[in-house]
From Swiss-Prot:
HAMAP family: AIRS. The keyword Nucleotide-binding applies. This is Phosphoribosylformylglycinamidine cyclo-ligase. Its EC number is 6.3.3.1. It holds the Pfam family AIRS. It comes from Myxococcus xanthus (strain DK1622). It is found in: Cytoplasm. PANTHER family: TRIFUNCTIONAL PURINE BIOSYNTHETIC PROTEIN ADENOSINE-3, TRIFUNCTIONAL PURINE BIOSYNTHETIC PROTEIN ADENOSINE-3-RELATED. GO terms for cellular component: cytosol. Disulfide bonds: none annotated. The keyword Metal-binding does not apply. GO terms for molecular function: ATP binding; phosphoribosylamine-glycine ligase activity; phosphoribosylformylglycinamidine cyclo-ligase activity.
Amino acid sequence: MGTTYKQSGVDIEAGDAFVERIKPHAARTMRPEVMGGVGGFGGLFALPPGKYQQPVLVAGTDGVGTKLKVAFAAGRHGTVGIDLVAMSVNDILTCGAEPLFFLDYFATGRLEVDDAAEVVKGIALGCEQAGCALLGGETAEMPGFYARGEYDLAGFCVGVVERAAIIDGKSVKPGDALIGLPSSGLHSNGYSLARKVLLDDGKLALDATPEGLDRPLVDALLEPTRIYVKDVLALLQAVKVKGLAHITGSGIPGNLPRCLPDGTRAVLSEQTWPKPPIFDLIAKLGSVARDEMFNTFNMGLGLILVVAKEDVAQALSVLSGRGVQAFEVGRVEAGQGEATAVIDP
């Protein structure tokens, strides 16, 4: 008998077993618009006729970054799938889009079916939280390309928004208010710095509970990214939101100006919102400067909305009614040139 594909490191049978394992998870995310099931060459999704007047499709893609390194070290794979979904659906949400469907790409050197199934279980949970269908995906087993026990993830999301309802920041003006929605922690950004400070240089054990934290370090580091979709879509039914920023890599200074017009600047007061203790731990242990912290991490705000000052009370009330404690964190002022964001101590 000649050399087989399995002998070269690609196990087709394991791949087939994996697909069977994840079908029930994908099935839980299905929407009425989905045509067919998991396993086809392409996923089919039919926009219902008459539901939209001028539908505009919005697409986004992202990964989880080196947060995966923490999952590998801890042997915990159940939450990074939520992160994967969150990063893309929160991105397209900034346009006012409702996520419709999601696809994932899972790449590894050797397929460990149990670990991979845990990842996809998390992806399905994230899709449920976002209200979108897990329409399909790709599993790539590439021997010699990844270290044993490691993998990488990429996610792709498509949503829809009415053309007249697109949030583009063009109507933002001086005097408007900024509302911050709290993050659950680091979300999925800044992990290269966090790992260097806490694990490489700080020599902290993942199962340790450092001073200042109320739980083991691994729990704080693997806390999944918050998915804001359902709360914000509900808010959009009650309040005109002029701008939305997903606070990811580059922090507030790098992301908030993306939803502001030129000639304006956002001014935030750091004392107006609470920060998860993981940020203080990183800053203290690594002697990380304040500007570096704000340019790397979300610093406690995962999403920032721009609304008219007179709409602040209603916006906070709507969010509070959904169990979201949001905060008025600043204002929009007149500026010069390209939009900027500053955070006052």
